[in-house]
């Protein structure tokens, strides 16, 4: 992954947001922390940044959870979005320029689906519910984003709720664009009948309407590589031409707990709000997540948090000293490591080295501790 853009250009980034039916867990936090680092790195390089993040507030898990809990799905979404944003603020994750819900973008989604119908990239299944599907072969570029073979695509498509064997589909990998209204489900009016959008077209419409085609980074967790990011790109490209949807596709690794991927379906979530309520310093949570490389699948543990708390204490002690060693070299190294695929483990190791020298030997530069604290704040988002 290269986060570089031309020095005078606006840097653009679209990151897939949450489905707001449960609280923010550390897997979410790790993903948005990775893109926060890119955001901060771009700002440090002097770029203007246009960062867009969506909220998937039209999706089956949200409706099912609201029905199970006996609450209105809109109220549930509003509550969980508020908690998510509070958690992100506590972790000092810079907010996106545009924070857009799918429900705010129905007009743009309908326009996109209509264009695909007119062009032949989409078709209607003629059965009891006239759902609209996107033809996976509508763009010759389909498959470039993931690089997966067909068998892998089919497996992941089905695992994510796809319906490869639905009667009437032209192709097994064709993706749902518009789900015709069913009794008891939310729906919106459209020229092709009431219904609601499919998952992938929501992000395509939001990204195209807020940024346009050819954005610098499309990002999210590694579980979104296929089908979500592949189809989001394909939807956008078949409407706007064959120009690629994004210059770079960047994916954060999964966070596990108890030897398993952390997920709502598995029920092994470590919630940011719970850690905060237990007294964990948000900066330590952030440091704990930064201790591993953003692309790596890795496990969270109580020991990892304890180590991060101890590191935070050492860093703060060094930053409060009246003087310290020169910081020019270590700040340059941190910038270099972050520019090299966000190598936070090496950046942290470099900072640990300076802190050790400062605590053991002191220094003669009265400005050094404050300068380093400012750099750590700006580049890593850790408040000393």
Curated annotation (Swiss-Prot):
UniProt motif ('HIGH' region) ranges: 18-28
Q: Which CDD domains match?
A: Anticodon_Ia_Cys_like (cd07955)
Q: Which UniProt keywords apply?
A: ATP-binding, Ligase, Metal-binding, Nucleotide-binding, Zinc
Can you name one GO molecular function term for this protein? ATP binding
Entry's family note: Belongs to the class-I aminoacyl-tRNA synthetase family. MshC subfamily.
* HAMAP family referenced in this protein's UniProt entry, alphabetically: MshC
What name does this protein carry? L-cysteine:1D-myo-inositol 2-amino-2-deoxy-alpha-D-glucopyranoside ligase
Lineage of this protein's species? Answer: Bacteria, Bacillati, Actinomycetota, Actinomycetes, Mycobacteriales
- Gene name for this UniProt entry: mshC
């Amino acid at each position: 992954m290269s986060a570089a853009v031309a020095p005078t250009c606006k840097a653009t980034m679209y990151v897939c947001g949450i489905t707001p039916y449960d609280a923010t867990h550390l897997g979410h936090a790790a993903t948005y922390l990775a893109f926060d680092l890119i955001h901060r790195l771009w700002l440090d390089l002097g770029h203007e940044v246009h960062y867009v993040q969506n909220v998937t507030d039209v999706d089956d898990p949200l409706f099912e959870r609201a029905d199970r809990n006996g609450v209105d799905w809109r109220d549930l979404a509003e509550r969980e979005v508020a908690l998510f944003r509070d958690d992100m603020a506590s972790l000092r994750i810079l907010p996106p320029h545009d924070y857009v819900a799918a429900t705010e973008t129905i007009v743009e989604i309908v326009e996109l689906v209509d264009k695909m119908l007119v062009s032949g990239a989409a078709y209607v299944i003629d059965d009891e519910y006239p759902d609209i599907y996107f033809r996976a072969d509508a763009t010759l570029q389909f498959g470039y984003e993931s690089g997966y073979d067909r068998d892998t695509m089919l497996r992941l498509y089905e695992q994510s709720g796809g319906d490869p064997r639905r009667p009437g589909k032209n192709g097994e990998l064709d993706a749902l664009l518009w789900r015709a209204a069913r009794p008891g489900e939310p729906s919106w009016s459209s020229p092709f009948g009431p219904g609601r959008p499919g998952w992938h077209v929501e992000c395509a419409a939001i990204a195209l309407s807020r940024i346009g085609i050819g954005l610098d980074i499309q990002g999210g967790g590694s579980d979104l590589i296929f089908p979500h990011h592949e189809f989001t790109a394909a939807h956008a490209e078949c409407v706007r031409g064959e120009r690629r949807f994004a210059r770079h596709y960047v994916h954060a690794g999964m966070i596990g707990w108890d030897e398993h991927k952390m997920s709502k379906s598995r029920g092994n979530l470590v919630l940011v709000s719970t850690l905060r309520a237990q007294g964990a310093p948000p900066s330590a949570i952030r440091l704990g997540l930064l201790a591993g490389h953003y692309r790596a699948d890795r496990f969270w543990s109580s020991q990892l948090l304890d180590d991060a708390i101890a590191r935070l204490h050492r860093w703060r002690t060094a930053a409060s000293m009246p003087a310290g060693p020169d910081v020019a070299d270590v700040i340059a190294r941190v910038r270099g490591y972050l520019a090299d695929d966000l190598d936070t483990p090496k950046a942290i190791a470099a900072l640990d080295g300076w802190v050790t020298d400062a605590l053991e030997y002191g220094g003669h530069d009265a400005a050094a501790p404050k300068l380093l604290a400012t750099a750590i704040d700006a580049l890593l988002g850790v408040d000393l």
